[in-house]
Structure formats: C-alpha cells, structure tokens
A protein has these predicted regions:
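Glycine- and aromatic-enriched membrane alpha-helices
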Residues: 1-425
Length: 425
C-alpha cells in the first residue's frame, strides 16, 4: 500500500493543510485589529475557539456528511462516520492517503464559521455564538460543501468552485449578514466612532492570510503540478491588483489611501479568485481581482451605509460580495485549457455561467433561510445578545473577564478593572 502513495502529492497536501490552518488565527488577528479595544479578545476568541469545536465536529460527522456516499444529491451518508475506514484508504485519483485529504478539508470547515463571526463583533455572546456556529457547520456548511464537492446536485448541474468561493465565502458572508440583521445594530452605531483600534495587527493578519491562501487555493489541486502552479500565480496576481483597485477607488472617493484599505483590497482579491484559481488564466485573474476589490469597496463604503445594516467587520462586504463576484467570474473566464476537468465559461464559448448563477441563488437562499431558522432555535434557549451594560463595558470584560491592554487588577468576583474600560474604542 505504501508503494501506491504519491509522496510528492502527499507532502504538498500536508504542507497546504498547515498553511490553511494558519489562516484561522490570522483571521482572528485581521478581525481583532479592526475591533474596538474593549472587544478585541472576544473577537479573537470567536475565531480561535472554533478551531477546537469545529475540528471535532468535522472528524466525527462533518466529513461523512460532505464526502460520504451521496444520498439523492443532498447529503452524504454515515459510511464515513468517525472516519470509518479512512485510516488505510488511498485516494485513487491523486494517490494520497485519505487522512491527508481529511486534514486539508478540516481546515476549510474550521475557517468558514470563523469568517461569519466578523459580522457580529461586539454584540453577540460567546456561548450562544459557539452553539450557533456548531449547528451552522452541521446543517448549513456540510450540506453546501456536499452539493459542490461531495457529488451533490450542484456539481451534477455543472457548477464549479475550485477552493470555496461558494461553499465558504458566499455562505459565511451571507449568513453573517443575516445574523447581524437578526441581532440588530451595535448601540451607538452611526452616532459615535467605531474605528479599528490596532491597524498594524490588521495588516499583519492580512499579510499572513495572504501567505496561507496559497495553501488554500493551490492545495485544492491536491497535488503538485501545473494546476497548483496556476493557482499560486492567479492567487498572487488577484490579491496584488485587489490592493491597487481598492486604494485607487478609495483615493477617488475619499481623497486618501489607507492601510485598512490596502489590507481590505488584498483580502478582496484573494476571496474573488478563490472559486476560479484552478480554472482561469493569470491574465483573467488580473481582471477578477481588480473588479473584485472595486465591488467589495462599493459594498463596504457605500451600500452598507445607505442600507444601514451593521456588518461590524464587513464579513459580507468582503467575503459575501467577493465570493459572489468570483463565482460569476468563473462562469465568464473558466477555460478547459487550464483545467480539462472544468468547463468553458461564457468568454470561451461555454455555458458555465448559467450553473454558476443558479448555484449563487441557491447558496443565498439556503444561507438566509438556514441562518434564520438556527438563530430562532438557539435564541429560544439562550440570550444571543449581550446586555446594554455588557456591550458598553465591552465583551472582553463582560464575556471573558479579561482585557487586552492596561490590565491592573481583578476583584474577588473575577471582573476585570481597567483604566480604559469605558473607552469608546
């Protein structure tokens, strides 16, 4: 059996697994820097704690629900419950141990609900968020991932998603938007400044996210070769032009280039190329990343303000909108010259755009309806939102009993006392 393993492909997938794992704590830094100082630890904790919870969920039932034998195109069966039989299985197409594939996919499952947390920063209690994220992963992410990657009905319709533009970014972004609207806006939103408290932390998080994204996209080739190389290059190009596109529009609109804008533009470009990285040419990636940054900027800087919803850290504005554009762009620029197992987009004489648009409609509907139902179920048993006093004090102290900065003393009750605990930031 050992002789059947492609050691090069296996090493590549294991390396990319480590890179993708690194993305979740870096997402925590990216979000943490954008949060107010009284909420930074709570924001980081919402992402970091999910590494533990969702990893266990995925190993026990998530993997089999996604990649188990298909049941009517809807969900996988329980044939792989608890990874049954995977210990000695080698995937026939890539000749890697199934355990390596499981580890890689586990990192995707972990980061998806963590992205969603950016929509509710500063106002959702920790325990209900964890319960909601766990249920969301089981009943929303797992079915959607099966529909796309596990032999479900969307893949049968011909929809393509190379590394998670639909299953990860659109799903988490739209669910985040739904969740933030159900929770309501932060108190004082629109009336007092709610500025990022630590932009160096955000730019560091964005930079390391970029590094990890090479594993995210190129690792989805599940082996070394032309496809992985193309994914690395398209990822780099799209992120690079994303920075340029966002900052240019920002200068036109607001008159000054910002560090936050550069970080947001880079991430927008990364999100936009995610579904397309293994299907489009590097030249197409330039267009995809540039337009992706522009549409994300419009969503974050203009549409959100006009509609008045409080997507705290723009999970929908960047991931939902960027993923939507990326899925459409795949339907336009995908070519079998890059990936013979893919399909030709509209600009190459193919009919891929139709399945891509249909899959987007289904993803949006499923995310909105599913998130609404799960929110109502969890809120029937738990208070989802922090109290007025706790929100004013900050979730770091009220939910976790600690503060990120200027710690001075703890009372016997364990409540943290800090000189800056009433800061607006």
């Amino acid at each position: 059996m050992v002789n059947m393993i492609d050691t090069g492909n296996t090493a590549w997938v294991l390396l990319c697994t480590a890179l993708v794992f690194f993305m979740t704590p870096c997402l925590a830094l990216f979000y943490g820097g954008m949060a107010r100082s009284k909420n930074v630890l709570g924001t980081i904790m919402q992402s970091f704690f999910l590494i533990g919870v969702i990893s266990v969920e995925f190993i026990l039932i998530g993997y089999t629900l996604i990649f188990g034998d298909d049941l009517h195109g809807i969900i996988g069966d329980f044939s792989k419950f608890g990874l049954g039989g995977a210990e000695t299985t080698i995937l026939s197409d890539t000749h890697i141990p199934e355990l390596a594939f499981i580890a890689f996919q586990c990192m995707f499952a972990v980061i998806t609900p963590a992205i969603m947390s950016g929509s509710v920063t500063g106002r959702m209690r920790f325990a209900p968020f964890v319960v909601f994220a766990l249920l969301w992963s089981i009943f929303i992410y797992n079915p959607m991932a099966h529909w796309i990657w596990g032999g479900g009905f969307l893949s049968d319709l011909g929809a393509l998603d190379f590394a998670g533009g639909l299953a990860i970014h659109v799903l988490s972004g739209v669910s985040g938007l739904t969740l933030c609207m159900l929770l309501g806006r932060r108190r004082g939103y629109g009336r007092m400044p709610m500025l990022p408290h630590h932009l160096p932390m955000t730019i560091l998080g964005a930079a390391i996210l970029w590094f990890g994204w090479f594993g995210f996209n190129a690792g989805s080739a599940l082996g070394v070769g032309f496809l992985a190389a193309n994914a690395v290059l398209t990822t780099q190009i799209s992120a690079a032009v994303g920075i340029v596109g966002w900052v240019l529009v920002e200068m036109i609109h607001r008159g000054k280039p910002t560090v936050l804008g550069a970080a947001s533009g880079g991430v927008s470009g990364l999100v936009a190329i995610t579904p397309a990285a293994g299907f489009v040419t590097p030249m197409a990636a330039i267009i995809i990343g540039f337009i992706g940054a522009i549409v994300c900027y419009l969503a974050v800087a203009i549409i959100k303000n006009r509609l008045g919803y409080d997507d705290s850290l723009d999970a929908f504005g960047i991931h939902g909108v960027g993923g939507t554009w990326g899925a459409i762009a795949t339907g336009l620029w995908a070519t079998t010259t890059i990936n013979p197992d893919g399909a030709n987009g509209l600009f190459y004489g193919g009919s891929l755009l139709g399945p891509q648009l249909l899959s987007l409609v289904i993803a949006y509907l499923f995310a909105v309806v599913g998130t609404f139902i799960l929110f109502k179920i969890v809120s029937a048993f738990m208070d989802m939102r922090v109290s007025i006093g706790s929100e004013s004090l900050g979730i770091d102290i009220s939910e976790h009993g600690e503060g990120a900065y200027n710690q001075s003393e703890f009372k016997s009750s364990g409540r943290f006392i800090s000189s800056n605990q009433t800061s607006l930031l």
